Amino acid sequence: MNWIKKTLRFGEKIKTIIKARATKTEIANSDWTSCCKGPILKKDLEENLWVCPSCNKHHRISPRQRFDIIFGKNNYEVLKTPIPQDDPLNWNDAKPYKDRLKAARKKTGMDCGMMVVNTNILNLKITAIASDFDFVGGSIGAAEGEAFLYGIQHAIENEQPFVVFTSGGGMRMMESLISLSQMTRTTLAINELKKNNLPYIVVLTDPTAGGITASYAMLGDLHLAEPGALIAFAGARVIQGTVREELPEGFQRSEYVEKTGFVDLIVERKDLREKIGSLLSILLKKNSAINSSENETSEDSRALTKAAS
């Protein structure tokens, strides 16, 4: 019977250890977080733009944090975007979709997973969008699709460049075909932006995957990426199981994706403001020259037509 008592005592110790572990809420509210070399104060991480000073890991941040860093606090206007009906399919799995949305809104303070802003960068007026990974994994549903289209429309109406900061796991399964249709809608909207000769810059952040990668994330005039960002369509294990080969080191990270030509530049978070501003200046001058050339060609054609008649 002695071994039974020992087993019971051991079980009680395990229960005590489990109870002593911090909850997700306690971890989120803590002054500390962890990175490569152990615990680090969130305050120190924030002062370094949420980049680890030891390993240079670019931690995930919210749209508002990102906009504060790149555009400056109180230097942007958050635009109110249309919000369609919640849960049109009455989706229910381990947790009702409506409850997931309520929890996401409470956690992020956002109505949907995308924030659209009107702002300026180096004296250039722009429209910008950023996704929040904490909002149902940054996935794209009808509300996010509406936000993206609203941002494009605002950019076209105000003749502004369009900058997108991607972050998310793809299309939202709880909205099925409604979610998948956002790939088409965002692509068509980008085509309209390009017809108006307005620059479209994509900044790929960790993680960018699935249908996001397969649609608007790869349609920019230029693609920038933060260091170490996961950029993929399918997961590495899925690919490895399909090709039955060992994948290269760093596969699907921004450094590897840059080598294959899908990313133009890898830019540190601290340098994004200057880099985006300078690239937009170049693109705007280029597009202005193209428009001027097209106008001259059109005038020449009219003159020739008039002379011929």
Curated annotation (Swiss-Prot):
Uppermost EC category: transferase
CoA carboxyltransferase N-terminal domain location: 29-298
UniProt-listed InterPro entries: AcCoA_carboxyl_beta, Acetyl_CoA_COase_Trfase_b_su, ClpP/crotonase-like_dom_sf, COA_CT_N
Catalytic activity line of the entry: N(6)-carboxybiotinyl-L-lysyl-[protein] + acetyl-CoA = N(6)-biotinyl-L-lysyl-[protein] + malonyl-CoA
BP GO annotations: fatty acid biosynthetic process; malonyl-CoA biosynthetic process
Keyword field: ATP-binding, Cytoplasm, Fatty acid biosynthesis, Fatty acid metabolism, Lipid biosynthesis, Lipid metabolism, Metal-binding, Nucleotide-binding, Transferase, Zinc, Zinc-finger
GO terms assigned for molecular function: acetyl-CoA carboxylase activity; ATP binding; carboxyl- or carbamoyltransferase activity; zinc ion binding
UniProt family annotation: Belongs to the AccD/PCCB family.
Assembly behavior: Acetyl-CoA carboxylase is a heterohexamer composed of biotin carboxyl carrier protein (AccB), biotin carboxylase (AccC) and two subunits each of ACCase subunit alpha (AccA) and ACCase subunit beta (AccD).
Protein name: Acetyl-coenzyme A carboxylase carboxyl transferase subunit beta
